[in-house]
């Protein structure tokens, strides 16, 4: 009560921020006549003047008022678009490193130009991040004219650019590109072998468009660069053939071989399922007749079974993926776009390929990985724009330290958001949607229908075709035409069906796109085209504007709001309504019981709908539950990735320092001394008697590891007073002398090149193996909870031990190679480098997260061998240890049954 009163008197924090910004807007408006009086040349020279002032000690904020006035005037002259006052406020919020929430149609693309120009002045580069290549190209081309007029260069980063094109784009003052391309370029740069192979500069300032889509929706899915491992495609086909013999358990605890947990998106084998699958695998010769699936040696077979079960039970064709040209292509659940080249991890993609009977491609090994949370936190300053961020304001603040500021619209919103209509079945719901569409078409009202999957969009399209209603379909299968379809979706009576609208980036203008009409028309007919467009625009406005129909609720309220936000732009009239049924996934999983009881009480008949605040509240509560769960997943992923992130920073820093250095001989010397010190300590324990020394073992390990034969025993026999410190010093001196002789024989320059090449290759190989080990550790770490230990703390502890172990192994391997390998010329070193840097077929994954363990998935399961050898056919797995029954006590000592403890790892 008191809080409301205070807010009423002094305003909310958002109100106070906007109020402060309006004072700056006033100053910019006062400058407008002065700036408008400048010639084009004088206006363009302002950039040089601003840069000079920065070098003389002024700050970006000191220049803000004048710089914004200059950009506004340049935009008026070049683009014929003048920034509104609220757009200036939005850009100020971006410059502060905050998120500006601006409704659809408020001109976010133009807002970005102000903050991008101002932050590009220091010459460190400014990145504008969009959600797809089309928008990156469009915005770079469109706004590049404005930046060029002011003397700034513009680049664009999209897929299929070569290294030199990327380097040129990143060298520009302002670079447009997609979040995935920026992230993958960062990872690729940290896999480069020389500094001149890198393309990015140090991250300085980024403006993220559709920030909620990129930093929240896609934050559950890490970016992974991976390469192929052993070919096991035959196993996927064999296991896939077993799945149709299993029956699904209709309700938990009932008969059936597997249970599907739709909330967690997981599939579990039941008791009878284990027995059935074991019997089938014995018949197929995949395991021996006396083998159990839970024998330690067979546990990795569960990887293939789980992947095949998920592929059949959880992943549907035309919903989660499409099949095109013999390939399984993932469909992005947030945007409805097809994503060629992307692959699921954990063997899931291979299982889906086997299910669809298309060629199965190899599994992958992680070469480099980062989450969007950790990538975007590398920037000195980060800002974002979106139409819907307020529902996730707490998460933005908690994870990224970003505050959300709601920018008032230029014109008041007059859209009519009607209540949800709930039907008993999907059939009744679609019938009602078709009636609503027909009514709108008859009255000349444009309609946009949002669906959550390609399957539903095609189902609705089929119903409309039967009803004789002309319409356009916009989904992942037709995205080449999507910009054109959306541009014309505002014509009177136009019907457009679209999968999830997040990130489409093209405004729906009532009457259709005038720019597109003019682009395709004869210039002599321009006036007639404008008159026809005005007529269509007025007709669409008179009919009530764009009507948005939601065919079901998304699991996030924010994405529902994005769909609604397509209507009512810049004060236009509009309306929206969601049609739901008890068969919709969200209703079925989270809200059906309460709503079904309510419907029974009201005695609803077929074809009738219910519209009630209780229903809307029940649905919103269901969405909040899902949002909270997804937030937990993202938070958990970040906590686990932070451990890897600290290690990633160390390794990437080491690589950069290595590439920068011309001479690493001092580093090699320090490593050699460290390795010899460790060998010595293992065989000559500190403060021990000479009788306890393993001199023979020490001589052997030094000869084996660094190729140096030393008469240590003879030294001790000849010099009885030789104590351990002096002995270690002598060993190090001998090793240094032998290495110096080798350098002299080969040549200093050749040896320096050789040392650097070896160090980089060993570091990279060790890091790849370490990433795989971290993946495997993360997969099973949740089992520590059974032993009353905190999995996160255990993960941190073990990951640290693994990392220090990796660094020690790197040192030992480097010393061994540079000491033992014989090189004779620079050509030999270069040949060795080329062999180590064979171009590998890389895959760029935006992998889905495992909902069960709330972690980043591994790129591949642990394999027993490397390479590309194809097995000769079915071969039984041979048990090496004692058989553990599923109901026997677990060998770990927890007291639980094996199936309930470490047996669950499978």
Swiss-Prot record:
GO biological process, one term: protein import
Keywords recorded for this protein, A-Z: ATP-binding, Cell inner membrane, Cell membrane, Cytoplasm, Membrane, Metal-binding, Nucleotide-binding, Protein transport, Translocase, Translocation, Transport, Zinc
GO cellular component, one term: plasma membrane
Location relative to the cell: Cell inner membrane; Cytoplasm
EC annotation from Swiss-Prot or TrEMBL: 7.4.2.8
Cofactor dependency: Zn(2+)
Cofactor-binding details, from the entry: May bind 1 zinc ion per subunit.
Amino-acid positions noted as binding Zn(2+) in the UniProt annotation, renumbered to this chain: 890, 892, 901-902
InterPro entries named in the record: Helicase_ATP-bd, Helicase_C-like, P-loop_NTPase, SEC_C_motif, SecA, SecA_CS, SecA_DEAD, SecA_motor_DEAD
A molecular function GO annotation: protein-exporting ATPase activity
Keyword Transmembrane: no
Topology within the bilayer: Peripheral membrane protein
Catalyzed chemical reaction(s): ATP + H2O + cellular proteinSide 1 = ADP + phosphate + cellular proteinSide 2
Compositional bias of kind Basic residues: 896-906
Amino acids binding ATP: 87, 105-109, 507
A matching Pfam family: SecA_PP_bind
Purpose of the protein: Part of the Sec protein translocase complex. Interacts with the SecYEG preprotein conducting channel. Has a central role in coupling the hydrolysis of ATP to the transfer of proteins into and across the cell membrane, serving both as a receptor for the preprotein-SecB complex and as an ATP-driven molecular motor driving the stepwise translocation of polypeptide chains across the membrane.
Family per record: Belongs to the SecA family.
Subunit structure: Monomer and homodimer. Part of the essential Sec protein translocation apparatus which comprises SecA, SecYEG and auxiliary proteins SecDF-YajC and YidC.
NCBIfam families associated with the record: PRK12904.1, secA
Stated name of the protein: Protein translocase subunit SecA
Species annotation: Methylococcus capsulatus (strain ATCC 33009 / NCIMB 11132 / Bath)
């Amino acid at each position: 009560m008191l809080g409301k009163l205070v807010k009423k008197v002094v305003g909310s924090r958002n109100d106070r921020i906007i109020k402060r910004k309006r004072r700056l807007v006033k100053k910019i408006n006062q400058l407008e006549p002065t700036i408008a009086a400048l010639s084009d040349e004088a206006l363009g020279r302002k950039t040089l003047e601003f840069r000079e002032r920065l070098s003389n000690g002024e700050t970006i904020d000191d220049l803000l008022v004048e710089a914004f006035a200059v950009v506004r005037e340049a935009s008026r002259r070049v683009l014929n678009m003048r920034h509104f006052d609220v757009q200036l406020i939005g850009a100020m919020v971006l410059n502060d490193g905050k998120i500006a929430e601006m409704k659809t149609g408020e001109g976010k693309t133009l807002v970005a130009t102000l903050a991008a120009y101002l932050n590009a002045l220091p010459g460190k580069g400014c990145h504008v991040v969009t959600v797809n290549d089309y928008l990156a190209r469009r915005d770079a081309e469109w706004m590049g004219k404005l930046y060029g007029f002011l003397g700034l260069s513009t680049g664009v980063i999209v897929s299929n650019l070569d290294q030199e094109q990327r380097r040129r784009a990143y060298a520009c003052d302002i670079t447009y590109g997609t979040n995935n391309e920026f992230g993958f370029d960062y990872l690729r740069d940290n896999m480069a072998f020389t500094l001149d192979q890198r393309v990015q500069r140090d991250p300085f300032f980024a403006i993220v468009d559709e920030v909620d889509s990129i930093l929240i929706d896609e934050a559950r899915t890490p970016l992974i660069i991976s390469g192929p491992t052993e070919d096991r495609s035959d196993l996927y086909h064999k296991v896939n053939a077993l799945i149709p013999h299993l029956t699904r358990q209709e309700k938990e605890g009932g008969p059936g071989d597997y249970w599907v947990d739709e909330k967690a998106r997981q599939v579990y084998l039941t008791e009878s399922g284990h027995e059935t699958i074991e019997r089938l695998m014995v018949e197929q010769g995949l395991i021996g007749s006396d083998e159990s699936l839970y024998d330690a040696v067979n546990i990795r077979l569960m990887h293939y079974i789980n992947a095949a079960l998920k592929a059949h039970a959880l992943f549907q064709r035309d919903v989660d993926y499409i099949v095109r040209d013999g390939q399984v292509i993932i469909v992005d659940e947030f945007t409805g776009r097809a994503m060629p080249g992307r692959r699921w991890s954990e063997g899931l993609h291979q299982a889906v390929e086997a299910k669809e009977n298309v060629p199965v491609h190899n599994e992958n090994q992680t070469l480099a990985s980062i989450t969007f949370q950790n990538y975007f936190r590398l920037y000195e300053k980060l800002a974002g724009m979106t139409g819907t961020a307020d529902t996730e304001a707490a998460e933005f603040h908690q994870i990224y330290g970003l505050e959300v500021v709601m920018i008032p619209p230029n014109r008041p919103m007059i859209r009519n958001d009607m209540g949800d209509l709930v039907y008993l079945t999907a059939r009744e719901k679609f019938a009602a949607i078709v009636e609503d569409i027909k009514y709108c078409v008859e009255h000349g009202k444009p309609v946009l229908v949002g669906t959550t999957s390609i399957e539903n969009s095609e189902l609705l399209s089929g119903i409309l075709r039967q009803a004789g209603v002309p319409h356009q379909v916009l989904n992942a299968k037709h995205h080449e035409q999507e910009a054109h379809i959306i541009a014309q979706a505002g014509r009177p009576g136009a019907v457009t069906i679209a999968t999830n609208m997040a990130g489409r980036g093209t405004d729906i203008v009532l009457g259709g796109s005038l720019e597109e009409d003019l682009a395709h028309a004869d210039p002599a007919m321009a006036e007639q085209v404008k008159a026809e467009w005005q007529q269509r625009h007025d007709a669409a406005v008179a009919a009530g504007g764009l009507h948005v129909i939601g065919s079901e609720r998304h699991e996030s309220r924010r994405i529902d709001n994005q769909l609604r936000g397509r209507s009512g732009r810049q004060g236009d009239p509009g309306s929206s309504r969601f049609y739901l049924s008890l068969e919709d996934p969200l209703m079925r999983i989270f809200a059906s019981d309460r709503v079904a009881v309510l419907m029974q009480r009201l005695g609803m008949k077929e074809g009738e709908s219910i519209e009630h605040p209780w229903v809307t509240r029940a649905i919103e509560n269901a969405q909040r539950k899902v949002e909270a769960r997804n937030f937990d997943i993202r938070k958990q992923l970040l906590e686990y990735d932070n451990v890897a992130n600290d290690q990633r920073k160390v390794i990437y820093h080491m690589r950069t320092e290595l590439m920068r250095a011309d001479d690493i001989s001092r580093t090699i010397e320090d490593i050699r001394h460290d390795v010899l010190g460790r060998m010595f300590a293992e065989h000559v324990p500190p403060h021990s008697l000479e009788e306890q020394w393993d001199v023979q073992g020490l001589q052997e390990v030094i000869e084996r590891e660094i190729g140096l034969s030393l008469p240590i025993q003879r030294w001790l026999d000849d010099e009885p007073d030789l104590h351990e410190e002096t002995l270690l010093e002598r060993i190090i001196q001998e090793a240094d002398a032998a290495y110096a002789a080798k350098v002299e024989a080969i040549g200093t320059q050749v040896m320096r090149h050789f040392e650097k090449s070896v160090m980089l290759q060993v570091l990279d190989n060790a890091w790849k193996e370490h990433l795989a080990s971290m993946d495997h550790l993360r997969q099973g770490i949740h089992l520590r909870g059974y032993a009353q230990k905190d999995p996160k703390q255990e993960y941190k502890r073990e990951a640290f031990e693994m990392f220090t172990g990796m660094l020690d192994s790197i040192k030992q391997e480097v010393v061994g190679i540079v000491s033992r390998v014989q090189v004779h010329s620079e050509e030999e070193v270069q040949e060795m480098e080329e062999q180590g840097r064979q171009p590998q077929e890389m895959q760029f994954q935006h992998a889905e997260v495992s909902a069960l363990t709330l972690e980043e998935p591994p790129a591949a399961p642990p394999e027993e061998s490397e390479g590309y050898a194809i097995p000769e056919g079915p071969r039984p797995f041979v048990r090496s240890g004692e058989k553990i029954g599923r109901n026997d006590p677990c060998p770990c000592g927890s007291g639980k049954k094996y199936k309930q403890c470490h047996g669950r790892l499978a």
